[in-house]
């Protein structure tokens, strides 16, 4: 008997379309996020000593989705002109990269809201390095060790 051609085409399309999204592993998005994080955390990058809420604190009680959501919320503020510091206004490349990180991270696990602990603060550099470690771990868990 076999499969009807239309059904075979639909099954093939479904397989191809979902292949890279298995179990929350978004290889392309993770790779791009890690690449941007590597660039922004390079020595000499301006504005990385600015203080930001430590959105990644209290990781022991948090799920991966919670961490990614809070990281996304941390970057979201860079879209609001009144939240952008003078340093970032004068260094548009860094601001552009932070906005790319927001888009990339929020695409991993789109959530409407999550709570960010604004009682503790860290430097942007430490925040970005913590996030890079989380993203690299996620990438390696997805079965790739390019980074």
Swiss-Prot record:
Pfam families: IL4 (PF00727). The keyword Protease does not apply. Disulfide bonds join 47-87, 69-114. Glycans are attached at residues 20, 61, 90, 117. Coiled coil: none annotated. GO terms for molecular function: cytokine activity; growth factor activity; interleukin-4 receptor binding. Keywords: B-cell activation, Cytokine, Disulfide bond, Glycoprotein, Growth factor, Secreted, Signal. Residues 1-19 form the signal peptide. InterPro entries: 4_helix_cytokine-like_core, IL-4, IL-4/IL-13, IL-4/IL-13_CS. GO terms for biological process: B cell activation; immune response; interleukin-4-mediated signaling pathway; negative regulation of inflammatory response; positive regulation of DNA-templated transcription; positive regulation of macroautophagy; regulation of immune response. One of its GO terms (cellular component) is extracellular space. It is found in: Secreted. Participates in at least several B-cell activation processes as well as of other cell types. It is a costimulator of DNA-synthesis. It induces the expression of class II MHC molecules on resting B-cells. It enhances both secretion and cell surface expression of IgE and IgG1. It also regulates the expression of the low affinity Fc receptor for IgE (CD23) on both lymphocytes and monocytes. Positively regulates IL31RA expression in macrophages. Stimulates autophagy in dendritic cells by interfering with mTORC1 signaling and through the induction of RUFY4. Belongs to the IL-4/IL-13 family. This is Interleukin-4. It comes from Mesocricetus auratus.
